[in-house]
Amino acid sequence: MLHTGCNLHEYIVGDKFIKHTDLAKGFEDRRYNLGIQLNDNYEGGNYVCWDDNNNEIIISKEVGTAVAYNARIPHEIQEITNGSRWSIVMPISSLEIIETKTLL
């Protein structure tokens, strides 16, 4: 796996990111994301994702919560109603996997 950079995200009152996946044009090689919650002193702004049965999952807002997820999973950030939401997101792209064998 290859780490391809970190992004610092700030969402302020009124901001949101509608339901989407991270496989948009230009990001086809992205396989996973790692998100880390940096603060919890805001309202709204739930990080929501959906499982294969379309069940909604709301991720904890606790500071330090880390979520690793497949880039194909639909997710969103709901509207911020008070304060600012800060997080770091690290996309991870795949490299060609090379089979190795241990020689004894």
Feature map (PLM): residue ranges:
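Catalytic core of non-heme Fe(II) oxygenases with the double-stranded beta-helix
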Residues: 1-104
